[in-house]
């Protein structure tokens, strides 16, 4: 069974998924970060594929992507790192990246490499839903890779229902249409959006991402979904703390404050 499917079958709520950029802060940090996240009880990991024009990301992840590329990170290298560490890491791993580097690698080859490396799913923020259905879904399904699609407060109910019907794993509920980055709290407008999506009774579980960095935003996310995705906050901590384990500890502390 796909590890993402298994996670949502065994853990119905309070799921914490953490994002980091491959190759940041150092080229060969992937294994130590993954092991630290698993050791501290993180349920799922999103590994970012660095790209030179990350349009959905805020300044923290943009800077991390730039540094990772300078460090020499590539898809070929990342797949090698994941293959080496997979036997020691049991939690689901999702690759998150923009379409350009994936297409340069070749989508069919990308999916095959994901399977070899033990990757369970992918998030491609700039892949339009219609293109996914027409050109990518059959290939991803053949490799048992979950394609996780994003929805925002601006996504129509019709589109949300189509995404729910034609994808599996979970739906990535973006807290706002802006870029990633920390927020102090989710205002009433955002919480109304969360409630509206809940009222649709979708078949897929949902995780809330973008802007989660403290107790208030984390608790709001898990109150309205199966869990939360944290990225920018953890990427900042990887830079400021001495080790990945200390960065995870600081992250978990922040979610209690």
Curated annotation (Swiss-Prot):
Keyword field: Amino-acid biosynthesis, Aromatic amino acid biosynthesis, Lyase, Tryptophan biosynthesis
Gene3D superfamilies, sorted: Aldolase class I (3.20.20.70)
InterPro entries linked: Aldolase_TIM, RibuloseP-bd_barrel, Trp_synthase_alpha_AS, Trp_synthase_suA
EC number(s) reported in the record: 4.2.1.20
PANTHER family on file: TRYPTOPHAN SYNTHASE ALPHA CHAIN, CHLOROPLASTIC (PTHR43406:SF1), TRYPTOPHAN SYNTHASE, ALPHA CHAIN (PTHR43406)
HAMAP family for the chain: Trp_synth_alpha
Protein name: Tryptophan synthase alpha chain
Origin organism lineage: Bacteria, Pseudomonadati, Bacteroidota, Bacteroidia, Bacteroidales
Gene: trpA
């Amino acid at each position: 069974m796909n590890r993402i499917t298994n996670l949502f079958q065994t853990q119905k709520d309070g799921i914490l998924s953490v994002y980091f950029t491959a190759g940041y802060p150092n080229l060969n940090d992937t294994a130590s970060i993954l092991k630290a996240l698993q050791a501290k009880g993180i349920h799922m990991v999103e590994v970012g594929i660095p790209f030179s024009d990350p349009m959905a990301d805020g300044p923290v992840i943009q800077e991390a992507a730039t540094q990772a590329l300078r460090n020499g990170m590539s898809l070929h290298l990342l797949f090698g790192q994941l293959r080496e560490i997979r036997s020691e890491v049991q939690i689901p791993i999702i690759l998150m990246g923009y379409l350009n580097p994936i297409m340069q690698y070749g989508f069919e080859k990308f999916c095959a490499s994901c399977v070899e490396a033990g990757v369970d799913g992918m998030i491609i923020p700039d892949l339009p839903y219609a293109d996914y259905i027409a050109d990518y879904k059959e290939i991803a399904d053949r490799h048992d890779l979950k394609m996780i699609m994003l929805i925002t407060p601006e996504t129509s109910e019709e589109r949300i229902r189509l995404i729910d019907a034609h994808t599996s794993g979970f739906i990535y509920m973006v807290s706002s249409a802006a870029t990633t980055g920390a927020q102090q709290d989710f205002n009433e407008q955002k919480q109304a959006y969360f409630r509206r999506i809940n009222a649709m009774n979708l078949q897929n579980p949902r995780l809330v991402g973008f802007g989660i960095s403290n107790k208030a935003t984390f608790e709001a996310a898990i109150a309205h979904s199966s869990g939360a995705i944290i990225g920018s906050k953890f990427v900042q901590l990887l830079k400021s703390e001495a080790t990945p384990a200390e960065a995870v500890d600081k992250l978990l502390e922040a979610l209690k404050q």
